[in-house]
C-alpha cells in the first residue's frame, strides 16, 4: 500500500515562524511516506517542550506525556506491543536533563525505538534558560553571567551507554534528515537521531555554521558507510588517521590521493573512530559530521523479553490466567 505525505499530516503546528521544528516535522512526514509506515500501526511519543507538541501534528497514534519521561513511556509501548513502530521525540532539555537517565537506559537496553533528539541548545518553552547542551559561557536568563558548566555531547552520551545507532542531520537539510530517519527505522534497536536546529526566539544562530547549504559545504562532512571521508566545497579535503586521532589533509598535496583517505565504517563494533567523527566541529577546525555515524546490530530488549515470556510459558502447565482459574471445580453464580 502506498502512502502520501498528506496521510501523516494532522492539525496546524503552533510553533514560532522559522522554528526548526517545522522543518523536522515536514521531513518526518516525508520519511514515513517513503518508508510506507502504516499510520494505524505507529505511535509518536513525546515529553514536554516546544518540540514535544509534535504528536499533535501526526495522523498516527501518539502521546504528549510528562517532562523527561518520553523514553520510559515509549519503552512500555514497544514492550507491550512489539509490532508497533514507536518514534520518541524530545528536545535537548526534555531528553537530556530530567530525561537523561531514561535516555541512557533506553540505549543500554537497546529497545527498538526511533529516538529523535531535537537539539537547539536552549529551553524554549520556558523562555530561554540554558540546557544540558548549551556551551560553556552561554548567557541566558538562568545564566546571566554565562554558564560555568560543560555541555553534554549527545553522541558521547549515546556511545557511553553502549548505544548501537547514532546519526545526525540539520533541520534545514530535508534530504539529509529524511535519509537518517529512514536508516533509523531500518535499524533494529535504539536509534538516536540528533537534529541540529535553531530556536529563532531564544537561541537564533546557534547552528549557523551548518544551517545553510553553503555553510554545510564549508563546515560539514557527510559520512556514508564504506565511503571515503571527503569534504569541502570542491571535495578537496579528506580525513586521515593520525595516532589515536584524525587529521585533515588536502587531496593532491604531498602525494595524497583519495585512496589514502580514511573510509567510514558505520558497522564497526568498536566505536573509537565513530566517536572521533561524532565529536568533530566544536571549534576544533574540523567539519561537523552529518549522516549515519554508527549502525551496529545487537539483540534488542523487546525481542528478548518476548522470547523469554514464550520460553517460560512453554515450560509451565498453565499458560495464562484464564487457564489457571479453570484448573479446579468451577461454579457459576447467577
Protein language model regions, located:
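Conserved thiamine diphosphate
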Residues: 3, 131-184
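Short coil/turn connectors at secondary-structure junctions
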Residues: 11, 38-42, 80-86, 108-114, ...
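Flexible, low-complexity linker and terminal segments
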Residues: 1, 10-11, 201-334
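Short beta-strand segments
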Residues: 45-47, 89-90, 114-119, 194-196, ...
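Active-site diphosphate/adenylate-binding microenvironment
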Residues: 2-66
